[in-house]
Amino acid sequence: MIRGIGVDIVKVDRINEKNVQKILSQKEKEIYDTFKGQKRKKEYAAGRFAVKESLIKCFKRFIPYSQITVLNKQSGEPYLDEESVKYLFEKFGGNGTIHISIAHEREFAVATAVVIDED
């Protein structure tokens, strides 16, 4: 059963170094630091922020951004790491799967999250 669907859009230019420290998990910061240009760094952080805001809409409760880690498969497909999924279902109850998607278009990053309860 679908528990929640969330969508968020972020203007990439809103991202600055101060919010990056609040938005990204430790693992995400390590990946962020490997990018050379500011444009790519901002796009990366904006996409992660949009995912985390989408998850807040799914669960209808605030989630500390740094508790959630968004990674990418070899194919580029984004996913939540296992610890993040476990954290969310332990904190808010239930058991299931979380699907996410991120897209970038010009100055925007948009993300969608779908939480499916299997209980």
Curated annotation (Swiss-Prot):
Record flagged with keyword Protease: no
Entries under InterPro entries matching the protein: 4-PPantetheinyl_Trfase_dom (IPR008278), 4-PPantetheinyl_Trfase_dom_sf (IPR037143), ACPS (IPR002582), Ppantetheine-prot_Trfase_dom (IPR004568)
Catalytic activities: apo-[ACP] + CoA = holo-[ACP] + adenosine 3',5'-bisphosphate + H(+)
Residues annotated as transmembrane: none
GO biological process terms, semicolon-separated: fatty acid biosynthetic process
Enzyme superclass (EC): transferase
SUPFAM superfamilies: 4'-phosphopantetheinyl transferase
Compartments, record wording: Cytoplasm
Cofactor: Mg(2+)
Keywords: Cytoplasm, Fatty acid biosynthesis, Fatty acid metabolism, Lipid biosynthesis, Lipid metabolism, Magnesium, Metal-binding, Transferase
Superkingdom in the source lineage: Bacteria
Residues reported to bind Mg(2+): 8, 53
Pfam families membership: ACPS (PF01648)
A GO MF term: holo-[acyl-carrier-protein] synthase activity
Main location: cytoplasm
A GO CC term assigned to this protein in UniProt: cytoplasm
Database matches in HAMAP family: AcpS
UniProt function note: Transfers the 4'-phosphopantetheine moiety from coenzyme A to a Ser of acyl-carrier-protein.
Family the UniProt entry places it in: Belongs to the P-Pant transferase superfamily. AcpS family.
Entry protein name: Holo-[acyl-carrier-protein] synthase
Organism encoding this protein: Petrotoga mobilis (strain DSM 10674 / SJ95)
Phylogenetic placement of the source organism: Bacteria, Thermotogati, Thermotogota, Thermotogae, Petrotogales
